[in-house]
């Protein structure tokens, strides 16, 4: 399957046959960083802080620790065979065509759902400046812009993600520095609250809402990490994957500590966790609370671009998944055709049309944070399925192809053990989703997707698999 589409370094091959390796190491590193700083951090951290208090810091650290090993497994598998275009390919190769089909389509749906959440978030951020702006205007404008830019070249996507990620990095580093200065100067807000690290343990301790509050923070916190595997969909368009992928994956722990742990510590030191409003972004509210509305507008711009960045990643990855699925014969053939600029234009257009579902969600659930929570729960469950498939593929790889593991230049540490630990953790998170009413509703809806996929496989997949065996 993986050799049906050749991947070339430049413009030598016909556009309709080949993806091009036009993403440089600079692009890959920033795509990896941008993928790790998702909308869930900016939009969802208000609710997670409200649910868990300071213990949310440990929630992010635990999830980040687990996902680092998932990414190490993905990295070793992708580098074991450079013909793999994405994790959908190695799933199909190692687990069977059904796995490639389920993984590819689920990952496509993951990013469509995530894109809907981003559309919802963008609407909320736009209303910070324009309270009377219609929901669909901001959403439609962003979707059209992303489609236009992605239709250009893959390098344009890389450049967009580079600058989107740079904006996020500068903003978070600035927030951390400003917050530390406020704490050092014992800054007092207009409400009389003095900035202090003591807020982390003085107001009920590290676990003010007990274990139930701690566990409740996992759902949106998991969603904050979706996109961390995005570098796995760029493998076919990366100039030097042997160097770029390990470097991007190895930097994950540092990114998590810097962007998640430090920023949350600063937020809860300047604004006591009990004062954080769950319906609003604490990144924006921090500056509003200390009387800096201009800075709040800047941060609002940053979180808006963050949501746009996440949607941009989704548009890119969904179109590449549709391209791969079409090449395998389990998606419409039209998605297998590339434009003159070597981008899957029809897949891009189709995915962007699907993103408009985010506007529909706002009408079904008028509460922005309510719509966001429902969408992100579905997304988190589906992403955990994809991450589990990556781990299962790794276990089969270790059993069936030990020689490839032995000569691998990028071995996963504690490989087999951590695969089982991570999968047990994902089961634990799914169980937690049954405890809250809003997440339980989404959990009950999610199986419908797998039922639909199963029916599709009965009619399409088996026929295609038989053809491949011939």
Task: Locate predicted features.
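C-terminal membrane-solvent junction of multi-pass transporters and transport-like membrane proteins
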Residues: 163-164, 334-345, 384-438, 467-469
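Extracellular loop-to-transmembrane helix junctions
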Residues: 19-20, 43-138, 148, 254-257, ...
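TM-loop-TM module centered on a large, flexible mid-protein loop between adjacent transmembrane helices
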Residues: 89-92, 96, 128, 201, ...
């Amino acid at each position: 399957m993986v050799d049906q589409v050749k991947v070339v370094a430049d413009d030598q091959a016909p556009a309709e046959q080949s993806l091009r390796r036009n993403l440089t190491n600079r692009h890959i590193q920033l795509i990896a960083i941008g993928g790790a700083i998702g909308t869930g951090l900016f939009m969802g951290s208000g609710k997670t802080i409200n649910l868990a208090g300071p213990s949310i810091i440990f929630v992010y650290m635990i999830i980040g620790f687990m996902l680092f090993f998932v990414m190490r497994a993905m990295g070793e598998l992708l580098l074991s065979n450079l013909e793999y275009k994405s994790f959908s390919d190695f799933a199909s190769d190692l687990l069977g065509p059904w796995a490639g089909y389920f993984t590819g389509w689920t990952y496509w749906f993951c990013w469509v759902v995530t894109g809907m959440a981003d559309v919802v978030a963008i609407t909320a951020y736009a209303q910070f400046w324009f309270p009377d702006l219609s929901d669909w205007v901001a959403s439609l404008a962003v979707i059209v812009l992303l489609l236009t830019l992605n239709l250009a070249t893959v390098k344009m996507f890389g450049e967009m993600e580079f600058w989107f990620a740079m904006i996020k990095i500068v903003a978070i580093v600035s927030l951390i520095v400003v917050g530390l200065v406020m704490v050092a100067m014992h800054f007092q807000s207009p409400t009389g609250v003095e900035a202090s690290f003591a807020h982390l343990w003085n107001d009920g301790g590290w676990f003010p809402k007990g274990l139930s509050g701690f566990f409740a923070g996992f759902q949106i916190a998991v969603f904050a990490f979706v996109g961390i595997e995005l570098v796995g969909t760029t493998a076919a368009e990366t100039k030097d994957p042997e160097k770029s992928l390990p470097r991007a994956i190895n930097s994950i722990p540092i990114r998590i500590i810097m962007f998640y742990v430090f920023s949350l510590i600063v937020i809860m030191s300047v604004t006591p966790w009990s004062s954080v409003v769950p319906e609003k972004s604490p990144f924006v509210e921090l500056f509003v609370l200390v009387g800096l509305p201009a800075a709040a507008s800047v941060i609002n711009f940053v979180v808006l671009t963050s949501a746009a960045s996440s949607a941009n990643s989704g548009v890119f990855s969904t179109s590449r998944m549709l391209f791969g699925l079409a090449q395998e014969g389990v998606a419409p053939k039209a998605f297998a055709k590339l434009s003159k600029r070597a981008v899957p234009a029809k897949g891009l257009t189709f995915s962007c049309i699907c993103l408009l579902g985010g506007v529909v969600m706002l009408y079904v659930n008028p509460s922005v944070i309510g719509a966001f929570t429902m969408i992100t729960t579905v997304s988190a469950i589906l992403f955990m399925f994809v991450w589990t498939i990556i781990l299962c593929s790794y276990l089969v790889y270790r059993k069936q192809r030990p020689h490839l593991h032995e000569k691998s230049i990028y071995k996963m540490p504690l490989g087999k053990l951590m695969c089982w630990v991570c999968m047990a953790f994902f089961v634990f998170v799914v169980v937690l989703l049954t405890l809250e009413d809003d997440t339980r509703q989404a959990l009950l809806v999610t199986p419908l997707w797998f039922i639909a996929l199963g029916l599709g496989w009965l009619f399409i997949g088996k026929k295609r698999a038989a053809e491949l065996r011939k």
